[in-house]
């Protein structure tokens, strides 16, 4: 598909000096989120399981702290937060960006291992990071947690059950935490992206097309027929929304499930 049209967005303000942790932030949309915050003056630490992406990010952006690790593990979560606090101070913003595509398969063909792997990456990691972030945020009566879900959490996506279920659970995690933590001054929101342009969505499209017995180009064209703007989402679109939520303009926004998806009418 051709490049999507862009609407001009003013540079983010009001996030300078904030301490931000972004999980799965060495590549793809996560890296764009990290760079957008850093370019706006925030102090950013990100982590990623992909050692090669981590090494490349470290080489290219010395102003962003980057660690290698799996935040599906409690000890890694502790290490990530300890390092952010040591370098920069208390964490103001947590962006739970970790997520895997999971298997493309009929429900009867999904292994327990694949199911549990999706739960661990897409949901447990969010819980572990939020749990670690909350005590300090409570003590300061301030903080923002942003969970990355998916537009498919609302409309379903055949042959992608573990992905859709875990992304749907993130919506419940978000709304419940927003109610629980709001009295402590902590805001919690979810972003529901559409198909984010990049290598990952191309792999997903290829896998789904193969499962359906169609070409990748035909499946992508059919997918975008159900998006009102007829385009994929750019990583910069996701980053801009999250930085807005962290800015002074977003200080009264919590408990919201925000679609950044071109308006998904129905996801094939």
Which residues does each PLM region occupy?
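Short C-terminal tail/terminal secondary-structure segment
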Residues: 2-11, 101-104, 155, 231, ...
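C-terminal helical subdomain
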Residues: 5, 190, 214-249, 253, ...
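Canonical Rossmann dinucleotide-binding motif of NAD(H)/NADP(H)-dependent dehydrogenases/reductases
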Residues: 14-45
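Substrate-binding pocket helix/loop in short-chain dehydrogenase/reductase
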Residues: 105-107, 111-119, 145, 223
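Active-site helix of classical SDR
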Residues: 130, 166, 174
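Alpha-helical segment proximal to the catalytic Tyr-Lys
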Residues: 135, 179-183, 251
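Residue(s) in the substrate-gating loop at a strand-loop-helix junction
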Residues: 150
């Amino acid at each position: 598909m051709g490049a999507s049209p862009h609407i001009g967005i003013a540079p983010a303000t009001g996030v300078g000096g904030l301490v931000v942790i972004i999980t799965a932030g060495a590549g793809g949309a996560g890296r764009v989120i990290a760079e957008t915050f850093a370019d706006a003056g925030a102090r950013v630490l990100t982590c990623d399981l992909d050692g090669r992406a981590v090494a490349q990010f470290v080489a290219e952006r010395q102003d962003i702290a980057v660690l290698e690790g799996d935040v599906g593990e409690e000890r890694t979560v502790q290490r990530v937060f300890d390092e952010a606090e040591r370098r920069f101070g208390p964490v103001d913003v947590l962006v739970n960006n970790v997520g895997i595509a999971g298997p493309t398969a009929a429900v009867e063909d999904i292994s327990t291992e694949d199911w549990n792997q999706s739960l661990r990456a897409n949901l447990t990691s969010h819980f572990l990071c939020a749990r670690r972030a909350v005590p300090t945020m409570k003590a300061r009566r301030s903080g923002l947690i942003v969970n990355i879900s998916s537009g498919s959490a609302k409309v379903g996506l055949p042959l992608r059950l573990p992905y859709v279920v875990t992304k749907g659970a993130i919506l419940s995690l978000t709304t419940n935490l927003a109610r629980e933590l709001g009295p402590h001054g902590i805001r919690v929101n979810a972003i529901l992206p559409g198909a984010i342009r990049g290598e990952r969505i191309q792999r997903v499209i290829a896998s789904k097309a193969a499962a359906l017995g169609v070409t990748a180009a035909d499946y992508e064209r059919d997918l975008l027929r159900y998006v009102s703007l007829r385009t994929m989402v750019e990583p910069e679109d996701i980053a801009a929304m999250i930085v807005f939520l962290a800015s002074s303009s977003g200080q009264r926004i919590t408990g919201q499930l925000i679609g950044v998806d071109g308006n998904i009418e129905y996801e094939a």
